[in-house]
Amino acid sequence: MEFGLREWLIVIGIIVIAGILFDGWRRMRGGKGRLKFKLDRSFANMPDDDSDPDLLSPPRVVKREMEPQLDEDDLPSMSAKELPRRSRNEPQQGDLNLAVDEPVPTLLNPVDDKPQEPKKSAKLSAEAAPVEEVLVINVVARDDLGFKGPALLQNILESGLRFGEMDIFHRHESMAGNGEVLFSMANALKPGTFDLDDIEGFSTRAVSFFLSLPGPRHPKQAFDVMVAAARKLAHELGGELKDDQRSVMTAQTIEHYRQRIVEFERRQLTQKR
């Protein structure tokens, strides 16, 4: 049987149509596979909440030890349980409107500079009182070399701090180092103490001022004295004020700490009634 032109055209048309249908069917199957693959990969690339190092974990209350090499994350976090009775700690200041030239706040009822022996009964009752609040100001050196011992010593002596118990510095009611302790200053680096015998070769990246409650009889005034001392050190030695969470201190944070003092005093009055 011989094919004419008409028959050949019909055969070719059938082949072309079949090819088009086959190609369309193949594309549909291939498209579904690619879509599934893309969806699977999109879910596979989603970050794992438990393993992503960039995700912040919920805040926890933990004890932090002071590290030998200090950077922003090495500043100590002080809690009431960690600090000795003599510790005094407090608020933070970054936008604080305390000018360096402003007079340091004075306490009510200043004490005599002459040495005085504390009454045993008062001392025992003070030691028995548990620490409820600890207010902290960290002063971090901007220079990688840190604060040099001689300059640091001169600065804090001018602010009325004196070397004493636990081998750290304390600010008493009297500039001569007498009277009750208002607040203290420790080395922010391990072991947290100072060695006056080697002060010439001493340096530290940061120091921590702290005020404990219950503590001084006039905590609000004591707090202002501590803020002034920390600001003076930061201004004159090139430091930055940070709070107990290692954040730059702001005026709002300072006010928050003052409010904590007010709340503490209110609780004390309620307990005495």
Swiss-Prot record:
Keyword hit for Cell membrane: yes
Coiled-coil residue spans: none
UniProt xrefs under InterPro entries: Cell_div_ZipA (IPR011919), ZipA_FtsZ-bd_C (IPR007449), ZipA_FtsZ-bd_C_sf (IPR036765)
Matches recorded under HAMAP family: ZipA (MF_00509)
Ranges of Basic and acidic residues composition bias in the record: 111-120
Cell compartments where the protein resides: Cell inner membrane
Topology in the lipid bilayer: Single-pass type I membrane protein
GO biological process terms on file: division septum assembly; FtsZ-dependent cytokinesis
Gene assigned in the entry: zipA
Predominant location category: membrane
Region (Disordered): 65-125
Annotated keywords: Cell cycle, Cell division, Cell inner membrane, Cell membrane, Membrane, Transmembrane, Transmembrane helix
Protein name: Cell division protein ZipA
Regions of this protein lying in the Periplasmic compartment: 1
Pfam families noted in UniProt: ZipA_C (PF04354)
SMART domains: ZipA_C (SM00771)
GO CC terms of this entry: cell division site; plasma membrane
Cytoplasmic compartment spans: 23-273
Spans through the membrane: 2-22
Family, similarity comment: Belongs to the ZipA family.
Function noted in UniProt: Essential cell division protein that stabilizes the FtsZ protofilaments by cross-linking them and that serves as a cytoplasmic membrane anchor for the Z ring. Also required for the recruitment to the septal ring of downstream cell division proteins.
Oligomeric and partner information: Interacts with FtsZ via their C-terminal domains.
